[in-house]
Amino acid sequence: MIETRFAIPDDLPNVIDLDSQITTIKKIDYWQDTFGRFVGKKGRYFLIAENRNGGETEIPLVGFIVGEIRAWEFGSQPCGWVLTILVKPEYQGRGIGEQLFEAICKSMKDDDVQTVRTMIAREDNLNMSFFRSQGMMAGPFIELEMSVD
């Protein structure tokens, strides 16, 4: 049985391990900073998915999702942003990402958010398919960028 809950500081090593399994880069400083800014903070969300068997944790962590509420950027009303979502490869396709996404959306809605956004690379078909399957579509903003070199 997969259960979602808010992250606690003890989850940090498992988050670092899962991220490094998927990205092949061990980003210890990045995740320490992210935990400090998101875990237990109002308007910020770090949710964990665990595989539970009879109340005991069978596998410490099978996925996580991170997001926050942002307000008034370029005239935007306060809205939720999903910043990252990861699910262990052997657990993908089992609805865990959907469960995490639904949990973060519920938490944001409980905090009076009416819109949830995310940003993905155009060629990231896996995440594009996932977020579209959750009902997300192109929004009213366009990302612009330039090199500062």
What role is predicted for each listed range?
Residues 2, 6-10, 17-77, 83, ...:
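Acetyl-CoA-dependent GNAT
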Residues 14-18, 33-34, 99, 103, ...:
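Alpha-helical elements of Rossmann-like donor-binding domains used by nucleotide-donor carbohydrate transfer enzymes
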Residues 35-36, 105, 128:
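Solvent-exposed, non-membrane alpha-helical residues enriched in polar/charged side chains
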Residues 98, 122-140:
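Conserved active-site alpha-helix within GNAT-family acetyltransferase domains
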